[in-house]
Swiss-Prot record:
This is Dimethyl sulfoxide reductase transcriptional activator. Disruption phenotype: Cells lacking this gene displayed a marked decrease in growth under anaerobic conditions using either DMSO or TMAO as terminal electron acceptors. Keywords: Activator, Transcription, Transcription regulation. The gene is dmsR. Residues 158-209 form the HTH bat-type domain. Involved in activating dmsEABCD gene expression related to dimethyl sulfoxide (DMSO) reductase. Required for anaerobic respiration on dimethyl sulfoxide (DMSO) and trimethylamine N-oxide (TMAO). InterPro entries: DmsR-like_N, HTH_bacterioopsin. The keyword Transcription applies.
Length: 224
């Protein structure tokens, strides 16, 4: 019996500091087979290998009285305009969390804000629109000694400039305790003045506070 030679696989490990959720409205060029699934998609498990994409798609039962979900397997060959390819090009693992009409919601983890900027730019090249809806900072700067700081922002109701400022603030630790960056750092990163950064973040915080207050009122009003 021949002996199998053990080989050491090449492993690339890097810490992911940001969690993002993106709503991607697909263009015809970036059409995804998930759009063709009939019914409400409740879960997607997919594997992207080489030029092939395989997905197990769980679909909610059409009848409310039926508690059995259908699982559809979808296999397709990818192209350069495939969303999975774009994420892979940036070293990201996409997790599809929702499919509605022509919009796919994707969650992924990133190393830094530069990767986020590049990823969104490349997604916009193959999609109709790309919206960053949630951004979570998973770890504070190494110097702080705190690796459990989580800061999350819901960015859905912000303008593009406000979203950019909020993303930079979270990514650089502006909202961490202690702060990992100040207004000067953010101004340098964004290429704008400190006063402009301050104004944008004030608008962000105001919108987020208003949204949170409204949601709290609605929850209180619907409580029995």
């Amino acid at each position: 019996m021949s002996e199998r030679t053990a080989s050491q696989p090449n492993t690339d490990r890097s810490r992911r500091r940001l969690r993002v959720v993106l709503d991607v409205a697909l263009s015809d060029a970036a059409a995804c087979p998930l759009e063709e699934i009939d019914g409400e998609v409740t879960a997607v498990r997919h594997q992207y290998t080489g030029d092939d994409c395989h997905a197990d798609v769980t679909v909610a039962p059409a009848c409310p009285d039926d508690d059995r979900s259908d699982v559809m397997h979808v296999a397709t060959q990818t192209t350069d305009s495939c969303l999975c390819c774009v994420f892979s090009d940036h070293g990201c693992v996409p997790q599809i969390t929702a499919v509605a009409a022509d919009t796919i919601t994707v969650e992924t983890y990133l190393a830094d804000r530069t990767t986020l900027t590049d990823l969104v730019a490349d997604l916009k090249a193959v999609a109709n629109t790309v919206s960053l809806t949630h951004l979570t900072r998973l770890a504070a700067d190494d110097q702080s000694g705190d690796s459990h700081t989580h800061v999350t922002l819901d960015l859905f109701k912000l303008t593009d400039k406000q979203r950019e400022a909020a993303a930079a603030a979270v990514a650089k630790g502006y909202y961490a305790t202690p702060r990992g960056a100040d207004l000067s750092d953010l101004a340098t990163a964004l290429g704008i003045s400190k006063s402009a950064v301050s104004q944008r973040l004030s608008a962000v915080e105001s919108k987020l506070a208003t949204s949170a207050f409204t949601e709290a009122q609605q929850s209180a009003g619907s409580a029995p």
